[in-house]
C-alpha cells in the first residue's frame, strides 16, 4: 500500500510555485509509504507518491510513466490488484510488454489500453490517479467496496487530491474550515460519515465504485459510477449457494496472499479470521513456509470481563483452539491502559477526525506490534455486513425500527450540543435525510416480498455506512504503522453474489452467518465454526474508565478547551457521573460509556490539533 496526492490545473505557473506544498503533502503520507518517495512535476500537473513496497520491490517505483500511442500517461496508485496475472496476459496479447511483475505497471498499461474501462476489469483494493499529459486530463478511481480512500477538492482553478484529509490540509489552498454541516457530520453521525463527505469545507471523497475525470482546460469534474450493488434473481438452491460461497471465499483469500514481503493474519478465534488463517496456513505450509498469526487482548480482562448479549464470551479459549489446529507461529499482543490512552490521540492523527475511541486506538497499537514481523496482514472485516452477522440483521425489533440500526441515539447526541452551534440544522431531520436517501438508493428487484426488501435495505445501509466506518478505521490505523491490511471478504464478487441471496439462506438454521458456516463446514474445528459472534475485543479494566474520566475532567477545568465552545459542560458532567452504567451506546455495539468519554477527548484534541475553524 501507499499514499498518493497531487494537483492539476489550467495554469502551469500555479503548479510550479507550489513545490513546498507538495513536499508538505508528501510528508503527511510518510507513514503510509515509509519505503520510497517520488514526485512528478511537469507543466500543469504534480503527482506525489509515498510507497510501502510489497510487490516487485525494485521495479514498482512511482510515479510511473508510460508513453503509448502518442500519449504520455503518469500513474500514482495505492492498493493491490488480485487479478494481475489475468490482466497482464490480456495486455500482452494486445502488444504490451513489461519491465517487472508489479501490479502498478499492469494497471498503467491497462489504463493506456482500455481507458476508464480498465477499472471494471480490476479485482482489488485501490485508489489511483492517471495524468494524461497531452489531453490535459486527470483520471481518478476508487475500488468497489471503498477499502482505499481518496479525497479531493477544487481550489486555485485546479483539482487537489490525496489519500488522507491531512494531505489536502497540508496545501495552503485548503484551510481546516468546518461549516455547520461538517460539524453535524461529526457530532450526529460520527465516527460514520455521509458517503462522499470529507467533513472539511469543500472537501469530498470519491465514492466506492466511482471514477472521475477532471479536464484542466475547462476545470470540469465529471463523476461516474461504474459499480453498485444490484438485486438479481437468485436461481441457486441452498446447496449450490453454499458451494459457490465456499469457492468465492477460498479464492478471495488465496488471491490476497500474493506478496514479496512477509504476510500474517489477524486471529480472534472467531469465524472470519479463523477461516482466513486456515486457508493462509495451508497455502504457506504447502510452500514450506510458516504463517504468523496475531491476537490482541487486554491486561486483566480475564479478571474483569463479563459477558453481554453483544460479547457472549472471551476470545482466548478459541484462539488457543486455533493455535493447536494451525501450523502457524502465534503472537499474543496484550495492551494496557497506559498504552491505550495516549493512542487515543494518535488515532485522531491517523484518521484526521474523532473516531471509535479505544476501538481505534487499540487497533493502532496492535498494528504497531505486528509491523516488525510482517508488512502485510489479512483480516476478517466485512463478513458481518455481507453475510448478515450483526444483531440488527437478526433482531426483528431492531431490524424493523426506523433509522440507522447502529446509531439510535440522535436525541442523546444532540443533548450534548450547545444551542446554536449547528445553526438552523435540526438533528433528527439531518440524520433522517441521510437514512432516507440511502434507502432510496437500494436496489430491489420487482416482486420481492417486503421482508426480503428490508434485508436488501439493511445490507445497503451496512455496506454504505457501517462497513465504510470500519474500513476507514482499518486503513488509517494500520497504515499509520506502515502495515498493509487486506480484507478478503471485501472481494466484490462475494458482495455481488450475496446481495441477492435470500435471507433464509444467510440465516441458515437460525444462526448468524449460517450460510457461511455451512459453506465452510469441515474447514474449522466445530467449536470455532459454530461459535457465537463476538465483536472486536475491548478493555474491561476499570483503570481505563478512570483514566479517560480523569482526562476529561482536566478538559472541563480548562476554560480554553475548544470542546467547551460546542459541547455543554453539564452534559459531560452527567456522562462522567454515570460511570459504566450508561445504557446508551454512542455508536454500534462497542462504544459505551468509557468509549463515549474517550470520544469527547478525541473531539477536543481534533479541534485543537487541526486548528479547526468553525464557520
Predicted regions and their residues:
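Short acidic/histidine-rich active-site segments
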Residues: 374-384, 388-390
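Adenosyl-5′-phosphate
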Residues: 1-4, 23-27, 42, 72, ...
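Cysteine-centered catalytic environments shared across enzyme families
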Residues: 1-345, 350, 363, 521-522, ...
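Conserved glycosyltransferase catalytic-site signature
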Residues: 103-104, 123-125, 180, 274, ...
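Amphipathic alpha-helical interaction/coupling elements
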Residues: 106, 244, 248, 252, ...
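Phosphate/ATP-binding catalytic cores across multiple sugar-kinase/actin-like superfamilies
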Residues: 243-265, 369-373, 377, 470, ...
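Short secondary-structure boundary/capping segments
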Residues: 308-311, 347-349, 391-398, 615
Amino acid at each position: 500500500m501507499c499514499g498518493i496526492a497531487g494537483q492539476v490545473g489550467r495554469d502551469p505557473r500555479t503548479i510550479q510555485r507550489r513545490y513546498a506544498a507538495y513536499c508538505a503533502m508528501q510528508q503527511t503520507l510518510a507513514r503510509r509509504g515509509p519505503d520510497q518517495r517520488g514526485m512528478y512535476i511537469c507543466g500543469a500537473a504534480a503527482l506525489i507518491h509515498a510507497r510501502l513496497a510489497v510487490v516487485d520491490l525494485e521495479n514498482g517505483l512511482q510515479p510511473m510513466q508510460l508513453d503509448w500511442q502518442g500519449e504520455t500517461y503518469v500513474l500514482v496508485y495505492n492498493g493491490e490488484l488480485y487479478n494481475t496475472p489475468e490482466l497482464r496476459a490480456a495486455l500482452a496479447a494486445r502488444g504490451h510488454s513489461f519491465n517487472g511483475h508489479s501490479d502498478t505497471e499492469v494497471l498503467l498499461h491497462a489504463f493506456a489500453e482500455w481507458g476508464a474501462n480498465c477499472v471494471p476489469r480490476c479485482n482489488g483494493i485501490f485508489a489511483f490517479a492517471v495524468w494524461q499529459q497531452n489531453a490535459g486530463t486527470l483520471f481518478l478511481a476508487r475500488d468497489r467496496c471503498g477499502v482505499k480512500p481518496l479525497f479531493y477538492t477544487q481550489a486555485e482553478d485546479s483539482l487537489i487530491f490525496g489519500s488522507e484529509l491531512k494531505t489536502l490540509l497540508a496545501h495552503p489552498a485548503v484551510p481546516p474550515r468546518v461549516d455547520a454541516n461538517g460539524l453535524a457530520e461529526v457530532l450526529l453521525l460520527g465516527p460514520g460519515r455521509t458517503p462522499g463527505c470529507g467533513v472539511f469545507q469543500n472537501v469530498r471523497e470519491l465514492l466506492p465504485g466511482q471514477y472521475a475525470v477532471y479536464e484542466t482546460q475547462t476545470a470540469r469534474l465529471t463523476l461516474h459510477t461504474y459499480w453498485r450493488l444490484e438485486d438479481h434473481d437468485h436461481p441457486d438452491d441452498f446447496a449450490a449457494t453454499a458451494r459457490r460461497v465456499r469457492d468465492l471465499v477460498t479464492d478471495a483469500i488465496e488471491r490476497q496472499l500474493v506478496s514479496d514481503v512477509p504476510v500474517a493474519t489477524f486471529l480472534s478465534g472467531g469465524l472470519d479470521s479463523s477461516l482466513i488463517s486456515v486457508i493462509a496456513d495451508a497455502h504457506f505450509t504447502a510452500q514450506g513456509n510458516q504463517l504468523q498469526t496475531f491476537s490482541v487482548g487486554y491486561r486483566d480482562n480475564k479478571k474483569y470481563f463479563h459477558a453481554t448479549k453483544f460479547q457472549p464470551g472471551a476470545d482466548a479459549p478459541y484462539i488457543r483452539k486455533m493455535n493447536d489446529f494451525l501450523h502457524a507461529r502465534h503472537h499474543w499482543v496484550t495492551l494496557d491502559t497506559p498504552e491505550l490512552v495516549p493512542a487515543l490521540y494518535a488515532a485522531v492523527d491517523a484518521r484526521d477526525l474523532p473516531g471509535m475511541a479505544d476501538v481505534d486506538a487499540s487497533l493502532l497499537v496492535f498494528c504497531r506490534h505486528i509491523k516488525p514481523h510482517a508488512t502485510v496482514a489479512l483480516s476478517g472485516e466485512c463478513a458481518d455486513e455481507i453475510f448478515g452477522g450483526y444483531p440488527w440483521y437478526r433482531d426483528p425489533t431492531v431490524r424493523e425500527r426506523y433509522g440507522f440500526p447502529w446509531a439510535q441515539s440522535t436525541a442523546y447526541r444532540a443533548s450534548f450540543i450547545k444551542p446554536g452551534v449547528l445553526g438552523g440544522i435540526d438533528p433528527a431531520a439531518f440524520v433522517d435525510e441521510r437514512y432516507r436517501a440511502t434507502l432510496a438508493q437500494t436496489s430491489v428487484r420487482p416482486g420481492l416480498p417486503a421482508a426480503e426488501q428490508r434485508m436488501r435495505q439493511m445490507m445497503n445501509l451496512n455496506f454504505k455506512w457501517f462497513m465504510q466506518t470500519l474500513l476507514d478505521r482499518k486503513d488509517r490505523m494500520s497504515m499509520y504503522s506502515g502495515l498493509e491490511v487486506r480484507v478478503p471478504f471485501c472481494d466484490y464478487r462475494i458482495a455481488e453474489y450475496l446481495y441477492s441471496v435470500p435471507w433464509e439462506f444467510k440465516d441458515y438454521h437460525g444462526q448468524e452467518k449460517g450460510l457461511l458456516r455451512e459453506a465452510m463446514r469441515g474447514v474449522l474445528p466445530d467449536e470455532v465454526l459454530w461459535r457465537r459472534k463476538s465483536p472486536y475485543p475491548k478493555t474491561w479494566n476499570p483503570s481505563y474508565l478512570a483514566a479517560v474520566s480523569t482526562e476529561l475532567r482536566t478538559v472541563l477545568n480548562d476554560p480554553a478547551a475548544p470542546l467547551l465552545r460546542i459541547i455543554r459542560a453539564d452534559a459531560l458532567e452527567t456522562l462522567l457521573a454515570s460511570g459504566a452504567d450508561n445504557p446508551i451506546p454512542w455508536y454500534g455495539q462497542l462504544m459505551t460509556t468509557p468509549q463515549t468519554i474517550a470520544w469527547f477527548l478525541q473531539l477536543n484534541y481534533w479541534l485543537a490539533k487541526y486548528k479547526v475553524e468553525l464557520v
